[in-house]
C-alpha cells in the first residue's frame, strides 16, 4: 500500500505551519518513542508541514538517554548530568510549544494491526492506552496515521550468572537511571561489569553519587577491542566529538581512581539476603573463565550490562522485516519493508545517540513526504553514515561470545519471572532433544512470566540452540500488559481518530 500524497505547504507559510485554506489536509505522522530518535523525527516531520502525534510510555520526553530528575528534586544544573542536554531542551521546547505536535505521555502501545486487518488506507492501526499503568481509568485511543515512525529504543541485556538474582545486583541501565533520575547511590562499594562502551558512563554516573567504584571489568580482551575499533581509523574522524566524550570519561575515572580491566568478567555473586561479594575471573576470547584466575571482591552492589536488545514487539507486529542480526531492516529513507512505516534509533542497530538523532531526522522528513536526497537532509545523511558504523564496531569489539554459558551452574536462575534454573533447561533439552523455544517454554515455563521473555528470551534461545534468526521471543500480539476489562471494553471505549492538532480530545 502506498502512502498518501503529502500536502504541499503554501508559499510563505512557516515550515511547521498548518496548510493554507483550501489546501489538502496535512499529512499525519505518528511517532512512537520520545527519545533522541523520536524527538528528531517529530521535529523533522513538523518542518515538512505534517501534523504529528508523539507518544511515549513514561511521563517525560527524552527517553533513557535524557532521563530527568524528578520534579520534586530538581537540579540547579541538570545539564551537568547529561551529554547533549542543549540538544534535548531545544527539541523538547520546540515541539512542546508547537500546536501541530501533540505529545501524549503515559501512552502504552498495546497492539498494532497491519493494513489488511485494519481495513483502511492507513498503513497500520495503532492501539494505545493512555494513563498510569497501575491506574484503573486508562483511556483508549486508536491512531490510523498516513505514516508511522517507530523509535522504541532498546533495553539492557544482562547474561545470567550464579547469584545474579540477589538484591544489590543491578542492570547498568538501572544504575544509570538511579544516578541520573534520582541521584541515588546504589551502595558504598560497587563493581561495574559486562561489555561495551556503556560501562564507562555508568561508572562515571555511579561515582558521581558518592559510591566507591572498585573497578570496571570489560569481558572482551584487548585483541577484540583492537579488532573492533582500530581498523579503518579514518572512518572515525567525523566522530571526533566521541573522542571528547571518551576523554571526559577517562578523566572521571582517573579522578576517582577507577580501574578499567579488560578480559575479566563477574562470573558469580555471593550473599545471603543481598549481594556481599562477587567473583571476577579472567576470560578467554570466547568468554570462558580461565581456571585459577578467580578473585573474590567484597561489594554491596554490582552493575552489569552485556549490551542492548532492541525493542522489536511493535516492528514485528507491524510486519517489518528484520536483519539476520535481529534489527529492523531499513533503506536509505529509514523505510521498513512495510509501506508507510519507518524505523529509527537503536531498533535499527546499536549506534548511539548521534546515529539515533540522524536516523530520526531522516525518518521524520521522509514520513512527512520528503526525500532522503533533499538538500536540507545532507547533514543528517552524513551524520548517519559516520555514526551508524559504530554499531558494527561495537559488535566486533564487545559482542557476546558463546563461552558465557560456562559460567552457569544447574541452580542458576535463567528465567527470573518463573524461577526456571539452568539445570531444568539443560535436562529438558537433553531428554527431549527439543531445540525449539516454543516446546521449551511449554515444558519448563521459561519465558511465560510477566515479562514474556523480554529479559530471558534470547538467553534461553542460546541455551537451547534455537536458530539465531528466530523472532519467537519478540513476537507478541499484545505488546504491553493490559487488563481483561480494558481489552473487553476496547470497541465501545476506544477513541478512533487520525493524529491532529494539539488539544484533540
Regions found by a protein language model. Give the residues of each.
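Glycine-rich dinucleotide-binding loop and its adjacent helix/turn
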Residues: 152-191, 196-202, 324-332
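Short hydrophobic core segments
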Residues: 32, 143-153, 298-306
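FAD-site-proximal beta/loop scaffold in flavoenzymes
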Residues: 171-179, 301-351, 380
